[in-house]
């Protein structure tokens, strides 16, 4: 009989809204903790986000990691002001291809939970409180 560790998926994707030095809070700490847990089990998850401005930053926990990103990454101010593209974010997260993953884990306060998965993929979503800044600054959005 196979043990539980034999059945643990090796192709795992870890999805978050964005990796940015301008946005580090509880949700980002949750992603870091999930990543650390998976790595302790011998699995380095494929990271994915709408934008990534962290993996190239010296001292970041993501330094040197490969992060799949959405088309927002290449738009003007996409990396520095991703929230300005709020109406496009649900569509953008659907453009991230995670077809190779057996397990998709999303950490979401906005749209990461909307990443597309296939019928053979298990998707577990850690859903944080709703996007408070959009309510607090509703006229800006």
Give, region by region, the residue ranges found by the protein language model.
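Active-site donor-binding segments of glycosyltransferases and PAPS-dependent sulfotransferases
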Residues: 40-111
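Structural motif
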Residues: 11, 102-103, 122
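Glycine/Thr-rich phosphate-binding loops of Rossmann-like dinucleotide-binding domains
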Residues: 22, 113-115, 133-134
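Acceptor-binding helix/loop patch of EC 2.4 sugar-transfer enzymes
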Residues: 72-79, 118-141
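A structural signal for isolated positions on well-ordered beta-strands in alpha/beta enzyme cores
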Residues: 13, 46-48, 124
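Short amphipathic alpha-helix
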Residues: 27-38
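Nucleotide-activated donor-dependent transferases that construct or modify glycoconjugates
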Residues: 6-24, 50-51
């Amino acid at each position: 009989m196979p043990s539980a560790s034999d059945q643990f998926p090796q192709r795992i994707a870890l999805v978050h809204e964005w990796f940015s030095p301008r946005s580090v809070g509880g949700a980002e700490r949750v992603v870091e903790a999930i990543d650390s847990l998976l790595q302790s089990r011998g699995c380095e998850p494929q990271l994915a986000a709408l934008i990534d401005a962290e993996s190239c930053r010296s001292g970041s926990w993501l330094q040197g990691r490969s992060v799949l990103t959405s088309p927002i990454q290449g738009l003007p101010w996409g990396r520095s002001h991703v929230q300005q593209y709020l109406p496009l974010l649900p569509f953008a997260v659907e453009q991230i291809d995670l077809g190779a993953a057996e397990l998709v884990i999303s950490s979401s306060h906005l749209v990461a939970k909307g990443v597309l998965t296939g019928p053979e993929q298990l998707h577990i979503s850690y859903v944080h409180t709703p996007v408070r800044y959009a309510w607090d600054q509703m006229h800006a959005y």
